[in-house]
Amino acid sequence: MKVWSKRNVQRGNRKRWVGATGSLSARLAAAGQRFSVQVLSQGLQALDPDEASALGLSRLKVGYVREVLLRVDEVAVVFARSVTAHPHSQGPWRSIRGLGTRPLADVLFGQHGIARTPLQFASLQVASSLHRHVAHAWLGATGAALASRVLPARRSVFTRGAAPLLVMEVFAAPHAPWGWLTTKTRRGPPALPRTKP
């Protein structure tokens, strides 16, 4: 079954958020008073065959992976997973190793010589391995189960010096900036259940 498509099936403001080009981190930062990155894991991990195929490296079994939660005013809103071949994480993409809690966007949109493929979109169903992976990571990081059985997601491949980097972003929060006013003058988000830091 094909998961990823060129078609963005979301509606309204959520569709605009999921389909927006440019830096998602910058867009999130503009939606609240404080934007932050929580690193969940970083290092060598087994890859899904679909990830390896998206990288054009179908035989790749293990890659360098960075997983984070993107937060707005302390509320977790997006799960992001970045994947590249291990040698590339020591070469063209070595800067991702030292990001710490800085967003990957600092590298992707702040430097020259990086190309990006068009966005692909998916609605991750609760029975899918990707949904289960995100749900497990989300619960471990926030202490809260995912409220949505279907998760809007997008991905694209960034290439630098012939080295591909796959970036997937899952819009996992049921109430998030795509339902708020996207302006820095907003005093704060509506009342939401607080998650663990």
From Swiss-Prot:
Pathway membership: Cofactor biosynthesis; ubiquinone biosynthesis
Protein name: Probable chorismate pyruvate-lyase
Residue positions binding substrate: 66, 104, 169
Keywords assigned by UniProt, alphabetized: Cytoplasm, Lyase, Pyruvate, Ubiquinone biosynthesis
Family: Belongs to the UbiC family.
GO BP term (any one): pyruvate biosynthetic process
A single GO molecular function term of this UniProt record: chorismate lyase activity
Gene3D superfamilies reported for this sequence: Chorismate lyase-like
Pfam families recorded: Chor_lyase
KW Cell division (keyword) present: no
Subcellular location: Cytoplasm
Highest taxon listed in the record's lineage: Bacteria
EC number: 4.1.3.40
One cellular-component annotation, GO: cytosol
SUPFAM superfamilies: Chorismate lyase-like
Catalytic reaction annotation: chorismate = 4-hydroxybenzoate + pyruvate
Disulphide bond pairs: none
UniProt organism field: Albidiferax ferrireducens (strain ATCC BAA-621 / DSM 15236 / T118)
Keyword presence, Transmembrane helix: no
Annotated function: Removes the pyruvyl group from chorismate, with concomitant aromatization of the ring, to provide 4-hydroxybenzoate (4HB) for the ubiquinone pathway.
